[in-house]
Swiss-Prot record:
Parts forming coiled coils: none
Sequence similarity: Belongs to the thioredoxin family.
GO terms, biological process: cell redox homeostasis
MF terms (GO), sorted A to Z: protein-disulfide reductase activity
Highest taxon of the lineage: Bacteria
Record's protein name: Thioredoxin
Organism: Buchnera aphidicola subsp. Acyrthosiphon pisum (strain APS)
Function of the protein: Participates in various redox reactions through the reversible oxidation of its active center dithiol to a disulfide and catalyzes dithiol-disulfide exchange reactions.
Matching CDD domains: TRX_family
Thioredoxin domain segment(s): 2-108
Gene for this chain: trxA
Disulfide bonds listed in the record: 32-35
Length: 108
Protein backbone atom coordinates (compact mmCIF):
# COMPACT_ATOMS: atom_id res chain seq x y z
CA UNK A 1 0.00 0.00 0.00
CA UNK A 2 1.57 3.25 -1.15
CA UNK A 3 1.36 6.41 0.86
CA UNK A 4 1.30 9.77 -0.88
CA UNK A 5 4.75 11.33 -0.80
CA UNK A 6 5.12 14.92 0.35
CA UNK A 7 7.30 16.62 -2.24
CA UNK A 8 9.40 19.76 -1.78
CA UNK A 9 11.65 21.87 -3.96
CA UNK A 10 14.54 20.12 -2.20
CA UNK A 11 13.47 16.50 -2.75
CA UNK A 12 11.70 16.79 -6.13
CA UNK A 13 14.67 15.71 -8.23
CA UNK A 14 15.57 12.80 -5.97
CA UNK A 15 12.00 11.54 -5.55
CA UNK A 16 10.44 12.25 -8.96
CA UNK A 17 13.10 12.79 -11.59
CA UNK A 18 15.33 9.95 -10.37
CA UNK A 19 12.40 7.54 -9.94
CA UNK A 20 12.36 4.38 -12.02
CA UNK A 21 8.56 4.18 -11.64
CA UNK A 22 5.72 6.22 -13.04
CA UNK A 23 5.22 9.20 -10.72
CA UNK A 24 2.02 11.27 -10.52
CA UNK A 25 2.60 14.73 -9.03
CA UNK A 26 -0.24 16.88 -7.72
CA UNK A 27 0.62 20.60 -7.68
CA UNK A 28 -1.71 22.13 -5.08
CA UNK A 29 -2.21 24.80 -2.40
CA UNK A 30 -4.02 24.91 0.95
CA UNK A 31 -6.49 27.60 -0.18
CA UNK A 32 -7.49 25.72 -3.36
CA UNK A 33 -10.97 24.16 -3.00
CA UNK A 34 -10.71 21.94 -6.12
CA UNK A 35 -7.42 20.64 -4.65
CA UNK A 36 -9.29 19.63 -1.48
CA UNK A 37 -11.85 17.77 -3.59
CA UNK A 38 -9.07 15.91 -5.41
CA UNK A 39 -7.15 14.91 -2.25
CA UNK A 40 -9.26 11.87 -1.20
CA UNK A 41 -9.36 10.66 -4.81
CA UNK A 42 -5.55 10.72 -4.91
CA UNK A 43 -5.47 8.74 -1.63
CA UNK A 44 -7.63 6.03 -3.21
CA UNK A 45 -5.60 6.01 -6.44
CA UNK A 46 -2.32 5.72 -4.52
CA UNK A 47 -3.64 2.50 -2.94
CA UNK A 48 -5.34 1.03 -6.02
CA UNK A 49 -2.39 1.76 -8.33
CA UNK A 50 0.35 1.08 -5.78
CA UNK A 51 2.04 -1.46 -8.07
CA UNK A 52 1.93 0.89 -11.09
CA UNK A 53 2.46 4.49 -10.01
CA UNK A 54 3.83 6.54 -7.11
CA UNK A 55 1.73 9.54 -6.07
CA UNK A 56 3.20 12.73 -4.64
CA UNK A 57 1.91 16.18 -3.70
CA UNK A 58 3.80 19.46 -3.99
CA UNK A 59 2.41 22.51 -2.17
CA UNK A 60 3.24 25.39 -4.53
CA UNK A 61 3.07 28.03 -1.77
CA UNK A 62 5.59 26.31 0.48
CA UNK A 63 7.72 25.25 -2.51
CA UNK A 64 7.66 28.08 -5.06
CA UNK A 65 10.58 26.97 -7.25
CA UNK A 66 9.40 23.73 -8.89
CA UNK A 67 6.01 24.75 -10.34
CA UNK A 68 7.42 27.45 -12.69
CA UNK A 69 9.86 24.92 -14.16
CA UNK A 70 6.82 22.99 -15.44
CA UNK A 71 4.78 26.10 -16.35
CA UNK A 72 2.10 25.38 -13.75
CA UNK A 73 -0.43 28.18 -14.18
CA UNK A 74 -3.48 26.81 -12.38
CA UNK A 75 -4.09 24.25 -9.69
CA UNK A 76 -4.70 21.49 -9.19
CA UNK A 77 -2.44 20.31 -11.97
CA UNK A 78 -1.39 16.68 -12.24
CA UNK A 79 1.79 15.76 -14.09
CA UNK A 80 2.63 12.14 -14.85
CA UNK A 81 6.38 11.54 -15.01
CA UNK A 82 8.35 8.60 -16.35
CA UNK A 83 12.15 8.51 -16.64
CA UNK A 84 12.35 12.20 -15.56
CA UNK A 85 10.07 13.28 -18.44
CA UNK A 86 6.52 14.61 -18.27
CA UNK A 87 4.36 12.03 -20.06
CA UNK A 88 0.96 13.67 -19.59
CA UNK A 89 -0.82 16.55 -17.87
CA UNK A 90 -4.29 16.88 -16.35
CA UNK A 91 -5.50 20.29 -15.14
CA UNK A 92 -8.35 20.83 -12.70
CA UNK A 93 -10.25 18.63 -10.29
CA UNK A 94 -11.16 15.34 -11.91
CA UNK A 95 -13.37 12.45 -10.87
CA UNK A 96 -11.86 9.15 -9.82
CA UNK A 97 -13.04 7.60 -13.08
CA UNK A 98 -11.39 10.36 -15.14
CA UNK A 99 -8.16 9.97 -13.21
CA UNK A 100 -8.18 6.19 -13.66
CA UNK A 101 -8.76 6.60 -17.40
CA UNK A 102 -5.92 9.16 -17.56
CA UNK A 103 -3.54 6.77 -15.81
CA UNK A 104 -4.64 3.69 -17.76
CA UNK A 105 -4.13 5.50 -21.07
CA UNK A 106 -0.63 6.59 -20.13
CA UNK A 107 0.91 3.77 -18.09
CA UNK A 108 -0.37 0.64 -19.82
Amino acid sequence: MNKIIELTDQNFEEQVLNSKSFFLVDFWAQWCNPCKILAPILEEISKEYSNKVIVGKLNIEENPNTAPVYSIRSIPTLLLFNNSEVLATKVGAVSKLELKEFLDENIN
